[in-house]
A protein has these predicted regions:
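N-terminal secretory/targeting leader peptides
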Residues: 1-159
Length: 159
């Protein structure tokens, strides 16, 4: 039983991997792991550590199944009021920030992983993700059919 929020895509992924998706609120996750209501959960590494989940679930699997993204948004009206130089400066700052944040995030994540390993947490890397991806192909297909071009662009960016 793997903890999920009430999300059909996540439920499909969990089912594809052969687990039983179980809806548990985040606030109840620690006790749900502690009492066996669920056997596991998916969490960002920093959340896993900061919420003391290693105390009740001491195995961390690094499968890379999600990618967090944060966007800066601006209305067409506001963007149109900017000069071309201002627009270019914003785009350049965004690119610089993206690179800086990627480096910062990787450094912070590696630090947390080192701390977890030092404290006795069993950290398992999944070097061959292809079987995991194949197991989730059904839910991927079901949820990208109307956006196949965008999905392919994302895959191409990753490669």
């Amino acid at each position: 039983k793997l903890r999920v929020s009430n999300d059909p895509v996540m439920n499909g992924m969990v089912e594809g991997l052969g687990a039983n998706p179980t809806v548990v609120s985040f606030g109840e996750l620690y006790s749900a792991l502690q009492t066996g209501v669920v056997d596991g959960a998916e969490q960002p590494i920093a959340n896993y550590k900061s919420n003391a989940f290693p105390e009740v679930a001491n195995n961390l699997i690094l499968d890379g199944h999600t990618l967090g993204a944060v966007q800066a948004v601006i209305t067409d009206n506001a963007w149109g009021k900017l000069t071309e130089n201002q627009q270019a400066a914003i785009m350049e700052a965004g690119a610089d920030t993206q690179a800086f944040n990627a480096d910062l995030s990787e450094t912070a994540e590696n630090k947390v992983l080192d701390e977890l390993k030092s404290s006795g947490c069993n950290v398992v890397d999944v070097p061959d993700k292809a079987p995991w991806q194949e197991a989730c192909q059904k839910v991927i297909s079901e949820n990208t059919s109307d956006q196949a071009e965008l999905y392919q662009q994302l895959l191409d960016m990753k490669a």
